């Protein structure tokens, strides 16, 4: 313990920028640091460095109930902490996905959701080549090598994972405190291209947008969507913008010929943009999907627009439609749900009533998605609603005895689900949007995590 004074000095310096921001509520400043507990007690795995892995391989469990590493749809939100504080570890995770995307594992597995629907045994291969895996595997197998551990849904069919991957690669290249790393971008580029081409196969009606298939096939994996959806469609458009930005940088700075990909992605993007609003805009907000007729306001309908704006890409939707949608979400899913006391519910009718009083995901408050939504409100200039949402969730977690085991979901009947959840570290999105990515001392030390 001879070095403890030096350690204490470094910890104080690390915390000082956050503690000094008196324009942030005190409880938010507290929670920013406390939510990092999951990196230490969330089942993290960190291997030794080796050729191709300069800081080793790294992964955090989605949670102990869903014990597989770095679920990609979840880390879209939750990895914003890792990006800002330990960016080389964030790159390590994305390199692991880059290796996993081309791989295949034909092992057949029964898909759990079909049993819950009384439809018997339906099997699917564990991992199709070019499909973006949901996760990097589980501790009871060979993580990083055997991916797609979860089998509740057939993740080869998910319509958000490829977009999630592309957005995270461009985000980490663009916003890492270590500066732009072209070798990292080049390493991930082939997998990003494969992932988008694979996802485009699900554009069944050739409108440029991948179609959801009716079984839950996105992060809300108990919530069926049909046809083009606001959630997956907006992510797709944002991912195409990110892929174009990648292609241009790689060609300009490294001389990589990406003309074919630029032409292809530009065509898809033009068609997607032409049809997204036409199919989904109802005059006030974006319909959950184009074909199910489900009359709910989905809280995270414009996650893709949030990410595009966060990364300085062209927005997915016009400012006035973003603000109109966010106002509908605020009235229906926040103020209309328990008076805003719990946070934002995932999906309610426009009058704040549940479509199905026995529903699961629509009636839950997802902590990490709430933090992401709060950051979106902040980006769009509504700091009051951003603070209100964040405060409601922090109060539920820390006032309800759930601190240091933050759940994925909280309900109005005082139940909760999936503690030690990775997505909740999305609270660091609020730091990014409020401070314009103010640097935390120590995060800029390239390669120092190893």
Label each residue range with its predicted role.
Residues 1-58, 63, 155, 172, ...:
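Mature extracytoplasmic enzyme cores
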Residues 1-11, 56, 64-209, 227-247, ...:
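Aromatic-rich carbohydrate-recognition surfaces in CAZymes
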Residues 9-12, 19, 51, 118, ...:
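Intrinsically disordered, low-complexity regulatory segments enriched
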Residues 24-63, 98, 102-156, 204-227, ...:
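Extended glycan-interaction surfaces of carbohydrate-active proteins
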Residues 72-102, 162-164, 190, 238-245, ...:
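Active-site core of glycosidic bond-cleaving carbohydrate-active enzymes
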Residues 174, 178, 201, 249-252, ...:
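Secondary-structure boundary motif
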Residues 196, 273, 390:
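Short amphipathic alpha-helical/adjacent loop interface patches that line ligand
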């Amino acid at each position: 313990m001879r070095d403890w004074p030096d350690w204490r000095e470094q910890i104080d310096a690390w915390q000082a920028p956050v503690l000094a921001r008196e324009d942030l509520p005190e409880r938010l400043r507290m929670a920013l640091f406390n939510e990092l507990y999951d990196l230490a007690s969330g089942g993290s795995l960190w291997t030794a460095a080796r050729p191709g892995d300069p800081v080793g391989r790294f992964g955090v469990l989605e949670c102990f109930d869903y014990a597989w590493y770095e679920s990609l749809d979840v880390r879209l939100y939750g990895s914003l902490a890792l990006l800002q504080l330990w960016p080389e570890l964030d790159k390590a995770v994305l390199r692991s996905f880059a290796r996993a995307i081309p791989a295949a594992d034909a092992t057949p597995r029964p898909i759990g959701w079909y049993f819950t629907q009384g439809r018997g045994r339906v099997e699917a291969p564990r991992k199709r080549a070019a499909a973006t895996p949901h996760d990097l595997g589980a501790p009871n197998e060979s993580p990083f090598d055997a991916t797609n551990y979860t089998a509740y849904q057939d993740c080869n069919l998910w319509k958000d994972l490829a977009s999630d991957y592309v957005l995270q690669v461009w985000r980490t290249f663009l916003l890492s405190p270590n500066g732009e790393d072209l070798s990292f971008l080049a390493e991930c580029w082939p997998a990003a291209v494969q992932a988008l081409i694979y996802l485009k196969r699900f554009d069944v009606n050739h409108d440029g947008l991948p179609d959801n298939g009716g079984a839950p096939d996105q992060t809300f994996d108990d919530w069926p969507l049909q046809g083009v959806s606001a959630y997956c469609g907006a992510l797709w458009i944002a991912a195409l913008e990110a892929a174009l930005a990648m292609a241009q940088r790689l060609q300009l700075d490294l001389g990589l010929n990406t003309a074919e990909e630029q032409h292809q992605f530009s065509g898809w993007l033009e068609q997607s943009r032409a049809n997204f609003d036409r199919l989904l805009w109802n005059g006030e907000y974006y319909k959950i999907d184009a074909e199910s007729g489900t009359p709910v306001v989905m809280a995270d309908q414009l996650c893709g627009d949030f990410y595009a704006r966060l990364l300085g890409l062209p927005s997915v939707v016009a400012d006035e439609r973003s603000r109109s949608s966010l106002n509908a979400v605020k009235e229906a899913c926040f103020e209309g749900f328990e008076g805003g006391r719990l946070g934002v519910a995932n999906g309610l009718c426009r009058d704040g009533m549940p479509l199905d009083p026995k529903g699961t995901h629509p009636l839950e408050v997802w902590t990490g998605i709430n933090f992401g939504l709060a950051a979106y409100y902040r980006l769009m200039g509504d700091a009051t609603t951003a603070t209100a949402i964040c405060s409601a969730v922090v109060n539920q977690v820390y006032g309800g005895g759930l601190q240091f085991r933050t759940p994925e979901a909280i309900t109005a009947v005082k139940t909760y689900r999936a503690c030690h959840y990775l997505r909740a570290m999305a609270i660091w999105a609020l730091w990014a949007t409020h401070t314009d990515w103010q640097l935390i001392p120590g995060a800029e030390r390239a390669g120092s995590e190893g």
